[in-house]
Amino acid sequence: MTQHINRSVIGPHQLLYLLYGDKEVYRLEAKFSILSALRHRKNLADFTITLMTDQPEAFDGWPITVLSLSEETLGIWQGAGGYSHRRKACAIQAGVMLAGKTIFIDTDTVFFKDPALLFQRVTDDQFLMDEFELS
């Protein structure tokens, strides 16, 4: 990452997204997902939204924290074996350092209720997963 932010800047709870590459469909999915989270958020202070991306300019003016990722970082996160989904685990590892509670959100997630409710289900002994996927 090219930007370092401490926990007090992000806040106690965050939704964390990872977006990279040039496929417009993923960028549009991320925007729709973020908009759905913002639409259903009842209290502004309940959580923040953090996006790690190599396309920070696509989110200029959005009410989220955008952390710019370099090609070098994305390459390191992919690892020597070239496994692109390893980047997700690396983003989560980096992201959990930014807030008290972090929930990683895939770009194709759409919220129909206040995402703040999810943080009540996350504890030191309890994690949250929407769907286990093998890929």
Please identify what each model-predicted range represents.
Residues 1-135:
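Glycosyltransferase catalytic domains, chiefly GT-A lineage
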